[in-house]
Amino acid sequence: GTSGNSYFSKYPIENFNTFKDERLSKYIDIKKIKINKEDSFYLVNCHFNSFGISKEEIEYINDAKNIVKDTETYGKSVISKLTRGFKLRTKTTELLIEKLPNDDLPLIICGDFNDTPMSYTYNQMLKAGLKDAFITASKEIGKTYCGRLPLLRIDYFWYNDNIEIVDYNRIKQTTSDHYPLLISFNIKEAEELGEEQ
């Protein structure tokens, strides 16, 4: 099948930049959305490389009996794919952080990061001063992937201090191998930001 993004906004999208490292098969989109004459915010959407592990390889991983029996068949392939996936996501993480706007406008970053909260990617996002909307506002288990690997949270909604998260919901609908996330947020007024500093 095909994949891609659609953006629906009642506000004009001022510019559109897509960054794609030639070594990567995925992308980072950065848009500036103008709310009114004075106010804008950035919306960043990204899709990081997955491990590319096949259904057969997932069954191999999930079935402990096969670990010894099928090591030659699947073991080397799985290890190679894991190594490649980690390296690619490290590069994409570094590209994303490098390309983030450096002004003080509200910033939202969302997408399929294909990485867990224990990953290098997740920790680099925290180091960049971003916050995870799930940690801030969710009241449920964080599973966003509905494939055969259970309880994976690999889709994120990151934001900076100029955004206030109001609500976070996972829509339990499986039209894809990921659950949709529905996030409500407010953009903080300048006075609120001044009070916090």
Spans of features found by a protein language model:
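A solvent-exposed, charged loop/short amphipathic helix patch at secondary-structure junctions
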Residues: 58-82
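Structured beta-strand-rich core segments of catalytic domains in phosphoester-bond hydrolases
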Residues: 1-60, 169-173
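His/acidic metal-ligating clusters that form di-metal
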Residues: 44, 85-109
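Metal-dependent phosphoester-hydrolase catalytic domains
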Residues: 32, 98-107, 113-197
